[in-house]
């Protein structure tokens, strides 16, 4: 198994900034800013995890706990049909951060 690479200070600061925005799906649904966890988007690079700069903020419900179509890890295709693609949400997140 590959050794985990330690996150740089810049990566850690970037993720903290993203998480401070709250869940991007909840914000889009006008549910307010709910506490978020980092979700690394799927970049289709042969199972490799995306970089720590390809992260969107999702609440636990929209990340893992919400069930099919509500949580990205419970059914990505339906989730993206409901809320937008991961890339669209990443682009929106970067726009919110003025990056």
Could you tell me what each predicted segment is?
Residues 9-37, 61:
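Short cysteine-rich loop/turn motifs with clustered Cys
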Residues 46-54, 64-99:
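Polybasic, low-complexity binding patches
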Residues 2, 46-47, 60:
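Extended interaction regions within the primary functional domain
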Residues 3-7, 89-90:
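Terminal targeting/leader modules
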Residues 36-43, 59-65:
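Histidine-centered catalytic micro-motifs
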Residues 7-15, 43-49:
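Short, intrinsically disordered, charge-biased short linear motifs at domain edges
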Residues 34, 54-55:
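Conserved catalytic motifs of the protein kinase core domain
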């Amino acid at each position: 198994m590959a050794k985990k690479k330690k996150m740089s200070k810049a990566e850690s600061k970037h993720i903290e900034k993203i998480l401070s925005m709250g869940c991007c799906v909840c914000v889009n649904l006008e549910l307010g800013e709910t506490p978020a966890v980092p979700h690394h988007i799927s970049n289709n690079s042969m199972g490799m995890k995306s970089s720590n700069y390809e992260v969107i903020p999702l609440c636990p419900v929209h990340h893992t706990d919400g069930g099919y179509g509500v949580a990205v890890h419970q059914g990505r295709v339906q989730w993206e049909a409901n809320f937008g693609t991961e890339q669209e949400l990443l682009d929106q997140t970067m726009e919110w951060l003025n990056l």
